[in-house]
Curated annotation (Swiss-Prot):
Protein name per the record: ERO1-like protein 1
Residues bearing glycans: 110, 129, 286, 421
Enzyme Commission identifier(s): 1.8.4.-
Record-level GO BP terms: protein folding in endoplasmic reticulum
Subunit structure: May function both as a monomer and a homodimer.
Organism, scientific name: Schizosaccharomyces pombe (strain 972 / ATCC 24843) (Fission yeast)
Length: 467
C-alpha cells in the first residue's frame, strides 16, 4: 500500500502542477501573487477615473510634432485606419481641460488660482511646453483605445531599437545633449548598447560599471513597457480573416509568454507605478484642508467627484505601501554620479515617440512614457511634491497604471490558457505514442473537447491567489 507520506507527495506534485508558477520580482519586496492581490483591490477603482472622469479620460498632447531626433526624412507613416486618432474639436473639449489651459506653468495666474507648479529640472520626459494652442490636440483616451493597429515592420523595429539603445550610460559632467549631432540614435556611436530582452539575468558577467542596480532598473522599465504594449495588442487583436476583434494567444506566447524575464518586468513596472501612487497618497495625507489639492475645474461638484475617486485609488494603493524601497536607488556616490545621465536618457525616449509612424501608437507611447517618467520623478527625486506635477503628468500616471493593470490581468488569463494548451498537448502526445490509429485520433479528439474542463480546473485552483 502507498504510505501517507507518498500520498502527500503525490498530492503536492499535482497541486503544484495545477498552480501557475509564482514569480519573485527582484528589486521589489513582492511577488506575482502579491501583484495580483494588489491589482484586485484597485481593479474597480481605476476605470472610475480613466473611463468616467473628464479629467483623466482626456489628454492634451502635441501629437504631430514635425521634428524627429532619429532621422531627417520620415515618410513611414501608417496608412491603416486603425492607426488614426480621433481628436476633439473646440466644442467637444471638456470644460475641465479648457480651464486647465489657463493655468499653464508659464502663466502668472498659476501662482494664485491653482496649486499646480512646475520644475522642468526634475523631468524624466520631455513635456509639451509650447505656448501656442495650435500645436496641441485634445483626445479622448476612451475613444482611442490602445490595441492592434497593424503598425509593424522595419520602421517599428527601428523605433524599438533606438529606445533600447538608450541604456548606454556615460558619466560625463560635460555631456551636453544639445551639443550632440542628430544621427540615427540619441547615443554616441562608440557606446555599445545592452540587450534589454536578454534571457540571462546574471549580471555577474558584466563589468561593475554596467551591472549596477539603477541601470538594470532602467532596462527593466523599458522591457516591461514593451512587453506590456505587446500584451495589449495581443489582448485586443484584429483577426483579418474572421473580421473581428479577438485575443491572440500564439502571438502573446511568441512576444511575451515564452520569456519569463519579460513577464517579470511587467510585474516590476506595476510595482513601480504602484509605489508612485503610494508616494502621492503619503503626500495627500499631509495636505491640510486650507491648502487642499484640487484639479482646478470650473465645477466644484466635478472637482469633488474627481478628487474623491483619485483619493480612493491612491489610498487603496497605500494599503500595500512597502513594495519598492526607493532609497535603494542612487544610494552610493558612484550611482549618484550618473543620475543626471539616467534622467537624460529616459527623457530622450520621450522624444523618440515623435518618430513613431502610427498616430495611435504615438499617442499611447507618449502617454505611457510620461507616466513612467512621472513615477520616476516621484520616487527618485525626494523634493518632488504633488503640486510640482503638471496635469498631463498626473493623467499620464493614472492611465499608465491602468495600462499596466490590464497587462497584469491579461498575463494571468493568457497564462491559464497557455497552461491548458500545454497540458492537452502533453496528453495527446502520450496518446499518439501509446495507441495506434484510429484509436489515437479518436482519443485525441475527445481530449480536445475537454479544453474548457481543464481551463476551469486551472482557474479554480489559481483564482484565490488573485482575489
Amino acid at each position: 500500500m502507498i504510505g501517507i507520506t507518498k500520498l502527500i507527495s503525490i498530492w503536492n506534485a499535482i497541486w503544484n502542477f495545477l498552480l501557475l508558477p509564482e514569480i519573485i520580482i527582484s528589486q521589489t519586496d513582492t511577488s506575482s501573487t502579491g501583484i495580483y492581490q494588489m491589482q484586485s483591490k484597485v481593479r474597480s477603482l481605476v476605470p472610475v477615473l480613466t473611463e468616467r472622469s473628464d479629467y483623466f479620460s482626456y489628454y492634451r498632447v502635441n501629437l504631430y510634432r514635425s521634428s524627429c531626433p532619429l532621422w531627417e526624412n520620415d515618410n513611414a507613416m501608417c496608412s491603416n485606419q486603425g492607426c488614426a486618432v480621433k481628436s476633439l474639436n473646440e466644442i467637444e473639449i471638456p470644460k475641465v481641460w479648457k480651464k486647465l489651459s489657463d493655468f499653464e506653468p508659464h502663466s502668472k495666474k498659476n501662482d494664485t488660482k491653482c496649486n499646480w507648479k512646475y520644475n522642468p529640472d526634475l523631468d524624466y520626459c520631455y513635456l509639451d511646453n509650447s505656448t501656442s494652442p495650435d500645436e496641441y490636440v485634445y483626445v479622448s483616451l476612451v475613444q482611442n483605445p490602445e490595441r492592434f493597429t497593424g503598425y509593424a515592420g522595419d520602421h517599428s523595429a527601428a523605433i524599438w531599437r533606438s529606445i533600447y539603445e538608450q541604456n548606454c550610460f556615460v558619466v560625463d559632467d560635460d555631456d551636453n545633449p544639445s551639443e550632440q549631432p542628430k544621427s540615427n540614435a540619441l547615443f554616441r556611436p562608440n557606446q555599445i548598447p545592452l540587450n534589454l530582452f536578454t534571457e540571462n539575468h546574471d549580471d555577474t558577467s558584466l563589468s561593475p560599471s554596467v551591472a549596477c542596480l539603477e541601470k538594470r532598473m532602467f532596462n527593466r522599465i523599458i522591457s516591461g513597457f514593451h512587453a506590456s504594449i505587446s500584451t495589449h495588442v495581443c489582448q485586443n487583436y484584429y483577426d483579418v480573416e474572421e473580421q473581428r476583434w479577438t485575443q491572440n494567444l500564439d502571438w502573446w506566447r511568441a512576444k511575451v509568454g515564452s520569456f519569463p524575464d519579460r513577464i517579470e518586468n511587467i510585474f516590476f513596472n506595476y510595482a513601480l507605478l504602484h509605489q508612485a501612487l503610494v508616494q502621492i497618497a503619503t503626500q495627500m495625507k499631509n495636505i491640510t484642508s486650507d491648502s487642499s489639492f484640487t484639479f482646478c475645474p470650473t465645477d466644484k461638484d466635478v472637482d469633488w467627484r474627481t478628487h474623491t475617486a483619485f483619493e480612493q485609488l491612491v489610498y487603496h494603493a497605500y494599503q500595500d505601501r512597502h513594495v519598492i524601497n526607493r532609497e535603494q536607488f542612487f544610494a552610493d556616490e558612484e550611482a549618484k554620479r550618473f543620475k543626471d545621465s539616467f534622467r537624460k536618457h529616459f527623457r530622450d525616449i520621450s522624444r523618440i515617440m515623435d518618430c513613431v509612424g502610427c498616430d495611435k501608437c504615438r499617442l499611447w507611447g507618449k502617454v505611457q512614457i510620461t507616466g513612467y517618467g512621472t513615477a520616476l520623478k516621484l520616487l527618485l527625486e525626494p523634493e518632488t511634491q504633488l503640486s510640482d506635477l503638471r496635469p498631463e503628468e498626473v493623467v499620464a500616471l493614472v492611465n499608465t497604471f491602468d495600462r499596466i493593470s490590464h497587462s497584469v490581468e491579461a498575463t494571468f488569463w493568457f497564462s491559464l490558457k497557455a497552461k491548458t494548451n500545454d497540458t492537452l498537448d502533453a496528453i495527446k502526445a502520450l496518446i499518439y505514442k501509446t495507441y495506434r490509429s484510429p484509436s489515437k485520433e479518436i482519443l485525441a479528439f475527445f481530449i480536445d473537447q475537454t479544453w474548457y474542463l481543464f481551463y476551469a480546473l486551472f482557474f479554480i485552483c489559481n483564482v484565490p491567489r488573485v482575489i
